[in-house]
UniProtKB/Swiss-Prot annotation:
One of its GO terms (biological process) is immunoglobulin mediated immune response. It comes from Mus musculus. Gene3D superfamilies: Immunoglobulins. GO terms for molecular function: antigen binding. This is Ig heavy chain V region 914.
Amino acid sequence: EVKLVESGGGLVKPGGSLKLSCAASGFTFSSYAMSWVRQTPEKRLEWVASISSGGSTYYPDSVKGRFTISRDNARNILYLQMSSLRSEDTAMYYCAR
């Protein structure tokens, strides 16, 4: 059974920082590209960041330079470091395979 469990969310003031984690299990984590997506208060889904199995990273312009996706293949954890947060970053964040 594939499981992705996010943690690290919370309330942050504009300009603040937050780091999210996603613990993965049930598949060979290191073999898969992984992404973060978010659902806005208006229920719109937005792509936030992706990282390939080899570590290449991809971002939309809206978060480039502010968000950093990374992975720990030894621990099967995906990360999203968010900084310079804005009101428009308010959302529920989810990791995805």
